[in-house]
Structure formats: structure tokens, C-alpha cells
Amino acid sequence: MAYAAERYITVIPEIDLPGHMQAALAAYPELGCTGGPYEVWRMWGISDNVLCAGNDKTIQFIKDVLAEIIDIFPSEYIHVGGDECPKVKWETCPKCQARIKALGIKGDSKHSKEEYLQSYVIHEAEKFLTENGRSMIGWDEILEGGLAPNATVMSWRGEAGGIEAARQQHLSLIHISEP
């Protein structure tokens, strides 16, 4: 971090959640909807195995990981991912469905109740970061189901996510992957 700071470089860490957590689930299978076992993937991909949004231990795990990131990285911003999180396990998970019921979450014509459940997880992460003096960045999927109040949206699927974030009075970054 000192090397970067000496060169006026801000390192913004990214920890992807609640999806892209296959390795974490292999280490902590109780944080998944099925309890595992889970294998660490050796190749990139999108797994249906994601953090269980209905498990209180999951929310604490997220806060613990973010606390460690805060200790290591002085950046004002921390990227929480929020992309590519299949909801298929949440649809049948008793804990996730109980959380949906407890929060009074309802699906609508735009978003499923599970998409709103992901918004709950992202809001919890954003609230923790704000309480600790940091700002959250997330991929444009965090727009689905309601955006955390102080979030910055990094749109990787085109300009539509960035425009929608701006409409909602949020900072937005548009990632251009093609020349």
C-alpha cells in the first residue's frame, strides 16, 4: 500500500458478494444454502452456490471480511461486487425464504423477491461501510431490487446501468470493455 501511495495511486479492493463465493463456501460451508460440501473452482465461472442471504452468520461474515479489508486498504472506496449472483438456491432455501417473509419482501413485475433479497445483503454491506467511514462501489446488478443509499454503481454491461444510477442521484462509473 505504501508503494502505491508514494505514486499517488489509490488501490480500490473488490470482494465479490454474495455471488462468486465458491472458495469461501468451500472453507465455510455453513454460509451456503445447502451446507455443502463445496469445492474450490480451478477455473472462472458463475456458480449457483452463493452466500445464504437468510443466514445471520452470512451477514456477520460479510462484516468481518469488510472489516479486514478496511484495516488493510486506506481507500475511501471498497468494491463489493454484487454481480452474477444466481438466485436459484435462494428460491428453495428455507432460511432465505424465511428472511424474505420476515422482511416483508414482495416480488413485482420488475424484480423477483430474491432480487430484493440481494438488495438487502448489499444494503447491509453498504451500511457497515458507511458506519466505518467508507463508500461502496458495486457492479450495476446492485440496481436490481433497490440501490443502497450511498452506493456508487460501476456499470459493466453497458451505459444503461450508469444512466439509471445517475437518474437515482448516485455516482456512476461506466466500464468500457470494447474499443
Each language-model region and where it sits:
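Hydrophobic faces of well-ordered beta-strands that scaffold small-molecule active sites
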Residues: 11-15, 78-80, 136-138, 153-155, ...
